[in-house]
């Protein structure tokens, strides 16, 4: 397998009597020196207080975590974002193509 060609997607769900849990995640390994992971978590409960959570973590090859300017601007809005599995796959594909083009 060539570096930069790994794309994996995981979808799991479990149901209890009054709640459902859905985990969507997708990761890929771009060229050496870059690692980008996108993971979404969405939990549905009977209560109206639950809200979707979207988290993006980018880790350079030296292992340090950091937040991009986009992340910081998103934090200013302080509104969670939901990605459907189709939208998540589209985002991952676009980022992979961008990283391979550089």
From Swiss-Prot:
Disulfide bridge map: none
One BP annotation, GO: symbiont-mediated suppression of host innate immune response
Domain of life of the organism encoding this protein: Viruses
Start-end of Low complexity biased regions: 1-27
InterPro entries in alphabetical order: Gemini_C4
Role noted for this protein: Pathogenicity determinant. May act as a suppressor of RNA-mediated gene silencing, also known as post-transcriptional gene silencing (PTGS), a mechanism of plant viral defense that limits the accumulation of viral RNAs.
Name of the protein in its database record: Protein C4
